[in-house]
Regions:
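Selective transmembrane helix interface/packing segments
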Residues: 1-243
């Protein structure tokens, strides 16, 4: 069973079963790694917030992360998005550390499950939509009416824009889920080849495994970045009503 590349994505209960009616609230391995990701973030930035005359490596990492996200928000959503810095920063870090913890052997990749990524994406979608209506009222609906479109094509374009808008949580969640699941599946497959072929024939898949691991670490960062920057783009639409 452990040789099955899909076995690593199984969700199983840790501890007693907790159910309210038909709703299962049991603590699972997915819950554990979400909690661990949050704790690692809290520990790192708690250590990084200490005021030392000479910054240590943790402080430098915290400051670099702060500057990176701050610049991303400014470049993508503008000065009006600054009040939402804490949310974007927390979102990026949570997705990043969930991805990175999944790189540890025999761990669990939370973001390889569509239910996790979709809940995050749906929360962003609903939140951005609320911000848009609070900022512009029903004028927010102008987002679906591009300027300069001939009246004859306008009904079709509006329908396309609405469908595109409603598909945002789907595309945002599937992109992260699919990349993480595909990458970890390939790593497991090549790892299985190394074990099966042994010392003599296993050097080639081992080389691929090492290269794939490095690539997957890069993908883990890029997917967190893409998730955060798309959130900034959606926020920019809500705040500035650009099309």
């Amino acid at each position: 069973m452990a040789s099955n590349p899909m076995y690593q994505f199984n969700v199983y209960r840790i501890g007693p079963e907790i159910k309210i009616g038909e709703i299962d609230l049991s603590f699972t391995n997915a819950s554990l790694f979400m909690v661990l990701s949050s704790l690692v973030i809290l520990i790192i930035f708690n250590l990084g917030s200490k005021k030392n005359i000479v910054p240590n490596k943790v402080q430098l990492l915290a400051e670099l992360s702060y500057s990176f996200i701050s610049k991303m928000i400014s470049d993508t959503a503008g000065i009006k998005a600054k009040p939402y810095f804490a949310f974007i920063f927390s979102l990026f870090m949570f997705v990043l550390f969930c991805n990175m913890l999944g790189m540890i052997p025999y761990s669990f990749t939370v973001t390889s499950h569509i239910i996790v990524t979709f809940v995050l994406a749906a929360f962003i979608f609903v939140g951005v939509t609320i911000i848009g209506f609070m900022k512009h009222g029903f004028g927010y609906l102008k987002l679906f009416v591009p300027s300069g479109v001939p009246m004859l094509l306008l009904p079709l374009i509006v329908i396309i824009e609405i469908i595109s808008y409603l598909s945002r949580p789907v595309s945002l969640s599937v992109r992260l889920f699919a990349n993480m699941m595909a990458g970890h599946t390939m790593m497991k497959v090549f790892g299985g080849f190394v074990v099966s072929l042994g010392i003599i024939g296993g050097w080639l898949p081992l080389s691929f495994s090492v290269a794939l691991t490095g690539l997957e670490i890069l993908v883990a960062f890029l997917q967190a970045y893409v998730f955060a920057i798309l959130t900034c783009i959606y926020l920019n639409d809500a705040l500035n009503l650009h099309h």
